[in-house]
Amino acid sequence: MKLIVAVDSNWGIGLRNALLVHIPSDMKFFRSETMGKTIIMGRKTLESFPGGQPLKNRVNVVLTTDKNYKVKDTVIVHTIEEMLDELKKYDSEDIFVIGGESIYRQMLPYCDVAHVTKIDHAYEADAYFPDLDSDPEWEITADSDEQVYFDITYQFLKYERKKA
């Protein structure tokens, strides 16, 4: 299982249920990596999408504790155990965790690859991703050249869980 996330220099990922910044090439990378795949998210992440609707051309799996929550064209699960059971139906190489904060934290132990867009700026944030740089289980295995979008410098990084 993989995850995909954009973080600032403090590993911030969001503020008031929105991304910290919108970078077109990051959005394009997200689309290219997740199109036709299974994506895992929490309810608040789904509700942050335009119209609160699932992303097209992907299997959208949403974790929520609300037993009455229903959204067309989504698979709704209510526990991590139920999610893991549901995910057995899909190729683990084609599953991406896409947020938010609590879903990332709960699913990180099941992930072996993390695609991280690292933004060289500290934004105001109220949601964070675990700092993989300080986690001895993870290492950077690929990185892009630094990119610039207006005054924003960023880089695409691939982290992999170290083999035991």
Model regions: which residues?
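Enzymes that bind and transform nitrogen-containing heteroaromatic metabolites
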Residues: 1-164
